[in-house]
Amino acid sequence: MENDQEKPSMVAIQRLDPELPLPVRKHRGDAGADLFSAESVTIEPGHRILVGTGIAIALPIGTVGLIHPRSGRALKEGLSIVNTPGTIDADYRGEIKVCLINLDPTTPIRIERGERIAQLLVQKVELVDFCEVETLSETERGVNGYGSTGVN
């Protein structure tokens, strides 16, 4: 029995490379949809590279696309994303690209065209404007930042 919350929202997508798959969620409950590499590349240890995915999307205003690493490749190979998560704004219409980095200290990572390289999550966001004030309201935490709540 399905309810409206289980039905995914639709996002317009433009396939820029007809040979590549569209993003896909492997399981119905998966938050992220796999993105595929539009090119074959080798990433040397400690290096980064911008890789296209062969798609462009039109996100609704009030949503954002967040690009996350794939956990298996991060664990097994050290493949990650430099600006995790990558941000796709609702008004961006260009090709989605992923800034990949090889965090392994010794082994190059080979990515073949059509391989899964990242996950795209689409989330609702609160759109805000900013209002300058002289002072901020007091809180229990105050200005205490990094490490201020302890290590355990």
Curated annotation (Swiss-Prot):
A GO term for molecular function: magnesium ion binding
EC number: 3.6.1.23
SUPFAM superfamilies per the UniProt record, alphabetical: dUTPase-like
Alphabetized InterPro entries for the sequence: dUTPase, dUTPase-like, dUTPase-like_sf, dUTPase_trimeric
Reactions the enzyme catalyzes: dUTP + H2O = dUMP + diphosphate + H(+)
Pathway in which the depicted protein is active: Pyrimidine metabolism; dUMP biosynthesis; dUMP from dCTP (dUTP route): step 2/2
Bilayer-crossing regions: none
Source species, domain of life: Bacteria
Alphabetically ordered keywords of this record: Hydrolase, Magnesium, Metal-binding, Nucleotide metabolism
Cofactor(s) listed: Mg(2+)
Family statement: Belongs to the dUTPase family.
Official protein name in the record: Deoxyuridine 5'-triphosphate nucleotidohydrolase
Source organism: Corynebacterium diphtheriae (strain ATCC 700971 / NCTC 13129 / Biotype gravis)
